[in-house]
Amino acid sequence: DSQYNPLEMSLLVDALHEGVDAVNGYKLTRNDSLFRTIIGRAYHNFVKIFFNIHIRDVDCDFRLIPRRILDEIELQSVSGAICLELVKKIEDAGYRFAEVPVNHYSRKYGVSQFLVPWRVLRTLRQLAVLYWKLVIRKEHKRKLS
């Protein structure tokens, strides 16, 4: 959908150094509709409070995560909640993120699936399941021990 500039990947590579295990981008300016921007901010606040996420933009899809980390993380989500699950499990495994500002562009291709009603319901359901598994039961931490 061309919402990120692939040339900015070099910024993430430069941020990956000793003491940093993975790099997550964060949108300098979100180029979405006002409604989508408001929903996005509410979502970020929600995940920071309820999931204790430490990065500022959990749904920025511009990341650099070494394969060795991905091999340790078992993902189960099949909706937009997968970004939250990925970041939460990486943080809880003790890995450290660096954050890099990246440009975010208006979608050039395709149509956002974000507000399709059945997808929203599926994501809300998966958020509830993730909260139960990752915050209440801490199932993933038992597997890491």
Task: List the predicted regions and their residue ranges.
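The conserved acidic donor/metal-binding loop of glycosyltransferases
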Residues: D1-Q3
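Acceptor/aglycone-binding surface of glycosyltransferases and processive sugar-polymer synthases
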Residues: P6-G80, Y105-V129, K138-R142
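A short, conserved alpha-helix in the catalytic core of glycosyltransferases
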Residues: I69-I73, S79-R96
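Hydrophobic residues at beta-strand termini and immediately following loops
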Residues: V100
